[in-house]
Amino acid sequence: MIRTATVDDVAELAELRRTFTFEDSTEGEALRSDFEESFTHLVSSGIRSGRWVVWVAEAAGAIVSHAFVGTIEKIPRPIAEHRAIGYLTNVYTRPEFRGRGIGGRVLDAVTAWARESDVELLMVWPSEASLAHYERHGFADRGEPLVWLHPEDPA
C-alpha cells in the first residue's frame, strides 16, 4: 500500500533515514547526538504545515520505501504559471524489497501528486546507480543547476 505519511510515521522514517545513511558506509564519521530530535522536529512540522509531503510504501505493517518532497512556493508573476517547485529527496527502498517495483510505484505516486498539485517541476540529485530508475519514471536530465555550496560542505 502506498500512502502519504503522517506524524505518527516520523519515528519509523527516522530509523529508515539512519539505515539509508549508513547503507553505503560513513565509517568513521561522527554521529550527530541530536539526529532524532532534529529529524523529528523538521519532518513533523513539515508534514503538519504541508511544506514536506512524504510517500511511504508499506508491507506487513512496516514502511519499506519512501520519498520526501519539499515544496517551494514560487513568487507570483502577472501571467499564468505553476505555483510550486518540488525538491525530491531521501528516496529509499529497503534492500530486501528492491527489484519488486515498489520504489517505482512510490515515484509514480509522487509524480501523480505533482501533476494534480500543479507543481512546475520536481528536481532530484540522483546517484549514478539510480539515474536510469528516475528516467524510467519520467525524469530527464536538463543539465546541472547553478549551486552555491557552503565552504565547509564536504560535497
Model-found features: residue ranges?
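Conserved GNAT acetyl-CoA-binding A-motif
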Residues: L107, A114-P126
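Conserved acetyl-CoA pyrophosphate-binding loop and the N-cap/start of the following alpha-helix
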Residues: F97, G101-A109
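Conserved acetyl-CoA-binding loop of GNAT-fold acetyltransferases
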Residues: V119, E135-P145
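A short helix-loop-beta-strand connector motif used in the catalytic cores of GNAT acetyltransferases and
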Residues: H41-V56, Y87
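Conserved beta-strand-loop-alpha-helix junction that forms the acyl-donor binding cleft
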Residues: L122-A132, V147-E152
